[in-house]
Amino acid sequence: MGYQFKPDPDMAVEKIRIGRVPALVVKPQKSAPDAPGVLWIHGGGYITGMKEMVYMGRAMDLVRKYGAVVVSPGYRLALQKPYPAALDDCYQTLLYMKDHAAELGFRKDQIMVGGESAGGGLAAAVCIKARDDGKVHVAFQMPLYPMISNMDTESSKDNHGKVWNTRRNHLG
């Protein structure tokens, strides 16, 4: 996995594997024992991975501003592995976080799930799965502009913008 963000001397960054899922752990160099844990799920329309994304900015802010411990999975992408592969990878990461909270440096009763775009959609799905399975309690969810549907409205059918448009919505 190639990650693109600037090193910060106040943060510790570690690459780990959770089964087959590569993940990035970011935390303060001097973390507090009562830190919250954050499962941060990157965006990218379900088709681009972390190395191409700049979506770690908000996750890094959670570390800087709140002393959170962030775990961000490099989930399998839709073009290679369709649904539910990405959801399974993210949920596996959440269960790992619960089981390894002390080792990672946060309270297991303070786990938040968040993400942007496709990551926001996955965050919502992970929280629903966690609720239904009852294996882990999510304290808070933060799906930012979540990609939760590939359905087009009449107005969105004419959206041919550069960043996200109808064609990309169907591809993702």
Regions found by a protein language model. Name each.
Residues M1-Y3:
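Alpha-helical membrane-targeting segments
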Residues F5-G172:
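Alpha/beta-hydrolase superfamily serine-hydrolase fold, recognizing
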